[in-house]
Amino acid sequence: FYKNTVSTYYYSDLSVKYLNLAKENGYKADDIPEYLGLSYAALEMPMESISAFSEALLIRESDTLLFSIAEQYYKAKQNSASKQYLHRVIQNNQDDELVQKSRILLGNIYLEEKDFENAEKEFNNVLLINKNSADAHYGVGVIYEQQGNIAKARAEWRSALKIQVNHPGALKKLSDK
């Protein structure tokens, strides 16, 4: 395998090739579908990734697997399916980090759907767990922006930048306004 500047798959394409070859030749391992899902995700092939992750879900259900499926549905623009998986992760999980990621993704979905009330609820739930969440501050800022309150929006984006100095969304918003 040769990797140049045009190809930046970092061997994920080879992983897919050889994992599928192993399955075709009868090799059985419980983790093959999960690794296939991760490889397809790295190759930005969400539907194939969802298929592989769903197969892995039948073998062993885990919260990180449910979150990975939700992420891929989000990338495939299937927000209703993504929301269902995110709600399962939030309800059944004790890992604060994964719950935060799930709530932030759910908040972003609500933002896209222009459901600002639920988006704000999700971002505020993240801030209750972790007041130093740059993504949650950024999301609240976007809500304020959509509501026409630019001063509060900019304050939230500055808070995001204090926490994470290179937050891409906050940097872009503050440079645009």
Model-predicted regions and their roles:
Residues 4, 8, 42, 75-76, ...:
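Register position in tetratricopeptide repeats
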Residues 17-24, 54-58, 87-94, 124-128, ...:
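Conserved structural position within tetratricopeptide repeats
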Residues 29-31, 63-64, 96-100, 134-135, ...:
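Helix-start (N-cap) detector for alpha-helical repeat units in TPR-like alpha-solenoids
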Residues 146, 150-177:
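Terminal, low-structured helical/coil segments at or just beyond the last alpha-helical repeat
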